[in-house]
Amino acid sequence: VSMDKIKINNSLYANILTQGANLKATNCLFGNSNNFSGYISIGGSVEFENCTFANYANTSRNSPSLLFKDYYESANNQINVRPFSVAKFTNCVIDGNNKNELVCDTLSSYTSSFDNVKFDHCAIKSEDSLINLSLFNNCYLNYESNFKNVDSWDFDLNENSELIDLGTNSSIIDDILERPRSVPNDLGCYEYH
């Protein structure tokens, strides 16, 4: 499945939920949700480029904006690990009103390597240290997104956003609003103009 320039907001559980999916998403906004902006789980091939996972919902959620998980528990309490063949997050924003907006709940380290999993040039809100540093390449911890207006779900960048020009170059030439991308790209689905 390919997704380009899609906005998904206001879901009860998750704006995007994958389970063993083959998915490529570019310039997508996964906004406010009662639980997860993104729940990426149990294997498959997933690629997110210049996507924004931003959850500022006015609920008392305990879940992160983005949950990345490579296993599930069956009905008979058996743990089943399903590693990802590819899981790439490039130039993405993972933000929200909780202290930790990314949870990587993985067991693959016990059965395989993380060679195919990478967060590259992503802005991540987290008070936790990113323990498995091999997963993270040039990521920015707790940078100020400074979105225009999270209360009205406007996740476009303000002029004082720390996400401007932090991305790695890519073949994506425009943003979610079809505005041209700068070199280097801004992080997330919006390019500041």
Which residues are covered by each model-predicted region?
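Right-handed parallel beta-helix
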Residues: V1-G31
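Short, charged low-complexity intrinsically disordered segments located at boundaries
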Residues: N9, S33, N80, G188-H193
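Active-site-proximal flexible loops/turns
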Residues: L12, L17, N34, A57, ...
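Predominantly extracellular beta-rich ligand-binding scaffolds that present long acidic/polar faces
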Residues: L23-D156
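Surface beta-loop-beta hairpin patches that serve as ligand-binding interfaces in beta-rich domains
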Residues: W153, N158-H193
